[in-house]
Amino acid sequence: MSDPRERIPPGNSGEETIGEAFEWLNRTVEEINREAVNHLPRELIFQVWQRSWEYWHDEQGMSQSYVKYRYLCLMQKALFMHCKKGCRCLGEGHRAGGWRPGPPPPPPPGLA
């Protein structure tokens, strides 16, 4: 007899589960971007997205969803570290940062 934990629950197929996962990923990336702009400089967010895309998609040949997943992990870590150090952004705002001169990179999903 096979292990019952290995069966797919009734009414669920692999396609529905995968589709739901992609929807969750897209929704979560947009949500974290909307929250991140309250705490991190936009240019930093854009640079993380651009570098994630360049490295994971262009250099490593990974899928768009994989790039979004890796970007999500980086942004979660950045927000965690920011809040751990004592977030005062909503009350005081951001001080001027030493960001690179020139035009900003294209916006990540949900911030266009």
From Swiss-Prot:
GO terms for biological process: symbiont-mediated suppression of host innate immune response; viral life cycle. InterPro entries: Lentiviral_Vpx_assoc_factor, RetroV_VpR/X. Keywords: Host nucleus, Host-virus interaction, Inhibition of host innate immune response by virus, Viral immunoevasion, Virion. It is found in: Virion; Host nucleus. This is Protein Vpx. It comes from the Viruses. One of its GO terms (cellular component) is virion component. It comes from Simian immunodeficiency virus (isolate K6W).
